Amino acid sequence: MKTFRLYITLALLFLSLGMKAQTFTLQGKVSDKDGHPIELASVSVLDQGKLVMTNLHGEFHIELQSEDSVKVVFAMVGYRTKTRILRHPRGKQTLQVQLADDNMLNEVVVEGKTPQHGTTQQLDVKDMKTAPSATGNAVEEMIQSQAGVSTHSELSSQYNVRGGSFDENSVYINNVEVYRPFLVRSGQQEGLSIINPDMVDKVGFATGGFEAKYGDKMSSALDITYKRPKHTEGNISASLLGASGYLGIATKNLTWTNGLRYKTNRYLLGSLETEGEYKPNFLDYQTYLSWKPKSNWQIDFIGNISENHYNFEPEDRETRFGTMENVKSFRVYFDGKEKDLFRTYFGTFAITHKLKNNKTSISLLGSAFSTREQERYDIQGQYWLTQTETSENLGVGTYMEHSRDYLKANVKSVKLMLNHRTAKHNIEGAVTYKIERIKENSAEYEYRDSAGYSVPHTGKDLYMIYSMRANNELHGNRVEAYLQDNWHFRSGNDSVPTLYTLNYGVRFAHWNFNGESIFSPRASLSITPSFNRNLTFRFATGLYYQAPFYKELRDTSTVNGITYATLNKDIKSQRSIHAIASMEYRFEMMNRPFKFTAEMYYKALSRLVPYSVNNVKVVYYGDNEASGHAMGIDLKLFGEFVPGSDSWLTLSLMDTKMKLNGKSIPLPTDQRYAVNFFFTDYFPGTTRWKMNLKLAYADGLPFSAPHRELENSSFRAPAYKRVDIGMSYRLYDNNERTKKSIFKNIWLGLDCLNLFGISNVNSYYWVTDVTNQQYAVPNYLTGRQINGRVLFEF
């Protein structure tokens, strides 16, 4: 019996040793075609039921059974799946795997190639160059089509995010905050934005709950990184709305990109109801030089010069508005002209040093922004407002508008940044010192004469309907600092764990102009559960401030009919508490990849500075007088609606309220619903023909008569409805030719802007009769226009 037990024990021992000998360890790293590690790529052996995910550095480690052949599959959304066959593996095996980009997602890739962990989504606009565009600002037009974002003018690159104003959106280029012009009051004047889409490499955009490294704005953060090309490249494009050229040069240690853009929307403005001589000319040049004298040193320089001229001599205008049963006609004959100038200089210089451990980097950045702005016009008009059916005169008179607005602004900054990476943490901090100098000298007035009487009519004195004077200087110094950590950790089963990404940080700022110091703690958590790798939950909260700048400071007081604008030193930062919960689900339908995102948010607003909006001009009350809220839900479906092309559909529902002087009213940017659709398609059987369709349908904004209290908001404008379609033909494709050429692609395009010719309302002109009765005459946006374009890529 003892002998039998001994045999059994020895047999079990040899069996266990044999089983142990049949296992092996597989380890390695997964990276993209450029050698960058791919996080959360799946490494699976389906025959053995084994699955692990790569870590932050793209590394993996898995224990497997040794067989004659072991089939290992490497997969990640946005990349081509790769399979490796291991023959009789033993001991420890190491694999270095590179995944190629998935060409089936080569159209406009809106989401990043990895699941979105934080509140910042990664956008790619390089293929938007073939989409129809009225502004030529591809990045901003891409932003305007995202969930929670809206615009009400195709002439403007500005956008509202979840009930916020244009001024509540921060923009960064290579870690330096940039600014928009101060005096711009209409989309016609805007010209080109500071972001050159040809030079953009990465775009990060957050609609709320963003990280502590992004500045003191309440609504959104746009983070732009300019490209460092790996080889010489370039393009030249031209259309009826302007032209652009881009050249990128690359050597072993140096890259140099240059972009030149010219825009004239004279052709587009010809479809407006106000006829006259439009002479808009916008010119922009940018350069980005990056030099690596050693592997651990990098020196960067960005320079920008922008010159925007807007000259206009109106002649006449006729507008018909109202209902089918009650049609009114508004006719004006003009004298005078407008002449505006916006000249901007911007530059940054950065030195970055990586320590020997290659995990820590230190950067010193300096920047300078300078703008010179002039807005000058003297325009007189004789108008008639009549009832069309009865020819009854509802208002007859003359008005004269005068403006001499001059502004100079200079902002200089120096910033020290520190970044430290480990396997699970990415710690980042910075300190910034800014010097702000702004000088304004403005004089505006508007005079109206209705049926021989000056408006407003008192029977005694002569008054202007509006008169404003401002002579102000701002000398401010601002200190900003932040510290944040991005922590990756996991729990549960080692082979298929639940993945977490926690971002937490705090931001501090002090401004000597009003003596205010603000602290802004922020945090977000992303969870990818073990039971479904295609599902991600995100939660974010934080205290956000809108630090006042020049426009918010302008407080007004009226003496003897003249409004004086002065700077309010007692104003405080507006405040918003964000609470966000979202879900992202990645799936396949019809054997094509899709992604559905749903996000709910609530923003508690306090210490608000009320403002009114006319076209794109935001005029503030100059004091913290209100509180309120903004809440809603944003839905987005992204994927291949048609094989080989990416499209997306967004739906946003929102409710905003502001309590002002004891009365609850909607915010001036209250938009109860918005639908955006971007669709890309190819002709069957060929990639030479491409079609892009952009659709926007958004609720109208609340309006009230000018120079009246904001709480007397009287009505809501009609919904904004617009469809643009573009057809592109690839005349030349170098990849299809055996004999190579300097050109990679040549595209010919034809766009139809405002396909259905819908008359959208941008703002209102208010006609007042002698009885002080006011009539709102709509100012319509552009009509249907055809645009031709050509693009050479090399």
PLM features: what roles do these ranges have?
Residues Y697-S704, Y729-F794:
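C-terminal beta-signal and adjacent terminal beta-strands/loops
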Residues K292-N308, K337-N514, T597-M600, W648:
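Face-selective signature of the C-terminal outer-membrane beta-barrel domain
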Residues S31-D34, A41-L46, A75-R80, P89-P132, ...:
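Short, acidic, small-residue-rich periplasmic hinge/interaction motif at the N-terminus
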Residues S403, V411-K415, K572, N591-T650, ...:
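Outer membrane beta-barrel strand-and-loop segments of large Gram-negative receptors
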Residues H61-E63, E177-F205:
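Short acidic/polar hinge/loop motifs at secondary-structure boundaries
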Residues Y267, E315-D316, R320, F531-A579, ...:
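Surface-exposed extracellular loop regions of Gram-negative outer-membrane beta-barrel proteins
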Residues S363-S367, E373-Y377, D570-N624, H629, ...:
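Membrane-embedded beta-barrel scaffold of Gram-negative outer-membrane proteins
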Residues F489-S491, S495, Y601-A604, D623-S704:
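Gram-negative outer-membrane beta-barrel transporters
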